[in-house]
Amino acid sequence: TNQTRDYMMNRYGEHGFDIDLYEGYETFPKKYWPLKNDLHSDQWSAIRYMISGYDENISRPSHLYKNAISYSRNAYGKPSLMLNELRYVLGDSLFYSSIQHLYKKWKLKHIDEDKIIDAIEEHVGEELDWFFDPWLHTTRHLDYEISSFKKVKNNNAWDIELVIKNKGLRFMPLLVETEYEDGSIDRQWWDRHLWRFEDTLKYSSKKKPKAITLDPDVQLMDLDYRNNSTKMDRRFIFDWPGLNYKPRHAVVYRWMPTFYYNYKTSDFSPGLKINKSYGHYENTNFHFYPSLNPKKIYWHMNGWRQAVHYFPRTKFYFWGFNKPGVEEYGVEIEKKWNRVYGRTSTHTFSGGLYFQPKYDSLRAINLGYNPNGRLAVGYLDWNSSIGAVDLNLNAASTMGDYSTWNFHRLTALSTFKSKKIYGVRTFQRVIAGKIWSENQIPGQEHYNIEGNSANDLLRKNYLVDQFYGSFDLFN
């Protein structure tokens, strides 16, 4: 796996494949898409597995892995990235010559872990247990960060002090790149890495430093590169539909212009949608669109965050919007669970709350809302699937004095998607539920075609309306 990736990237570039062999890459819009980095893609795939809570040791016998996906990750993906890190430590020349030495010594014979390590150490001339043991016999993670950076003018030179902190449990030497104000760069190795969770690197330069980066070539399996540089790279690209672009060393900003028009309320509303994302850890959408009549700025923001070292497969969601008709703010915690990693039913547990402090009666009434009050709802939710059937159970309740209305609701939702027969696929949805209340339920919390409440519909930018204009079909 490592050899194939190295060859393909060396021959065809960082994307790692021959564009001429793939249909569509010379046509719009893929012609203008940024190409992915093949190494980065493999690293992200391994990181998703490593932070899932289901990671297993590479050295485990194949028949003891919990399932085929774990076997695949530990037989191919992780070992290939381990060898990539070994090349980073030894350098290209010594790494490739050590692999050649291994082949010549044991060619056409069955070998084990000890013979591989002994042959490489024999050729390199140093012990590498500190490198191989954590990779092969543990699931320790690597995550270095620059915790502080100081630069002080000292006569005709600059004194630089860099504090490096290890947030993981695996240790590696680091290539440290210093970028200067004149655009030039300088690189040096920090090798005081063994069993150090924090260290200070001090050096001087005649040039004024601008930024510092750890592992600038992104060769290590460092879980989070946002803390590897004093100046994180940013990429601004048009938000092409279907684009999947996740560089390891850069935060990606996608942008797209939007246009809304509603002759009754907001008139013509040109706007801009911006998305900020970084790998498996963060995603934020911000959308604003000023209305010409009335002159008002409407907006919508939502996103999620995921911790690097804690709470595996747990996302923290947030959202807020001020749209024609209603204003809302909400938060949610979501936890996913599988019996093993992948290929089994995923159980998604979540809990959250949302608050609607005010309404615009002109638009809210048209949506079926009751604008005479405010609404605060807390909820718990479970979702899973059995084959082609999705199941959902939701329990919701208003939050005391924060809500004008008082009710409790329990809802079961089932959806089914059939296979295509003669090019036709059918979708079915069943909603069953009950609402308990001593007074009238506001229209925004009634059952409708979207599910639990009209809020499910409102949170979709392209459906801020009745169900195709039909009130009877909507409710």
Predicted regions and their residues:
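C-terminal outer-membrane beta-barrel translocator/porin domains of Gram-negative envelope proteins
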Residues: K315-G320, G330-E334, T346-G352, Y359-N475
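Short amphipathic beta-strand and strand-loop transition segments with alternating hydrophobic
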Residues: S147-K153, P257-Y261, L353
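Noncatalytic modules at the cell exterior or secretory-pathway interfaces
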Residues: K206-K210
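Strand-connecting loop/turn motifs
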Residues: D92, E127, A250-V252, Y281-N283, ...
